[in-house]
Amino acid sequence: MIAGINIFAAIRIGLAGLTCSIYLYGCTTVKKPRGVDMKLSVFSAAYALSAYTLAFINQFMWMDAVICLPLVIKGIDNIRSKKGGILYIAALSYTIISNFYIGYMVCLFSVVYFAGCVIGERIPRGQLLEKIWRFLLYSLIAGAISAVYTVPVYY
């Protein structure tokens, strides 16, 4: 039984590292390597083995947000670059469904991250309003998808 729990925890930590490496590989600040890049592996392992992850290693319900957070960030970057919002909708709705409290915190982080990214860009007002509208629309869709599960729990 204990070995199974440890294997399950190792799989979850590995998934957190995998999603972080997926985000970092697509990030514009990290150069795409021709082979295996050690920076990608080091930062993915550092994210997966962070103090938060290790502190809650035996409480599996908190780990879903750690796994999905890089995908939510990548989804926000996709929304900003007009690549679509399917990844953002799927990752955010799964995060909210898997754990309401941490999902709520990820939603707050998403707003702060999006605002920080948009403030850092110098774009015309029309494009700014379009990006904000798309972010709000995709966030509401993710909230509506997760509401199918969360609303009956509250009432």
Regions found by a protein language model. Give the residues of each.
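Membrane-embedded transmembrane-helix bundle of lipid-linked glycan/lipid transferases
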Residues: 1-155
